[in-house]
Amino acid sequence: MTTHDPASRRARLRQYQEELLERMQAARTGSGQRTHQLGVEIGGERFLLDLLEAGEIVPVPPLTSVPLTQPWYLGLANIRGSLVGVVDLARFFGMQDAAATGPAARLVTFAPSMGMPCGFLAARVHGLRQAADMTPSAGRLVDADGTAWTPLALGALAQDERFQQVGLQAGH
């Protein structure tokens, strides 16, 4: 029996469907451990985002600047007909590197369930990471290659007063 044999393909498809069903049931009941996170690069550092807090990942669209806003607020982007505020987290966090540019840069939006039409620029998206396989070290997680990742809670960021205040205050 070869791998191109119809019976073999049906067996592989059945196995795949069973595994997918198990994963979907675990996600629905919460019995599965959520350890997959999205790896992104911001300001030359690597961060891990909870997949439930991350929305779309798109190439950086044209931005419309908004006057009298904080320097880290880059403006508005139209994502599939919805206006999304775009933030430079590197500037917001006071990092040296400026806004992410170049072919690898992406706009990562907050999940719609967060109720905040916002996104941030990532210099690079590193894909899914398995946090359970990493070693905690001084508030960060270190992977098998020795790369340190900082957890980034978008929910906590969305609740931050400074993050919510994109307009310049009088006298600034």
Language-model segments: what does each one mean?
Residues 1-172:
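An acidic, low-aromatic, low-complexity terminal/linker signal
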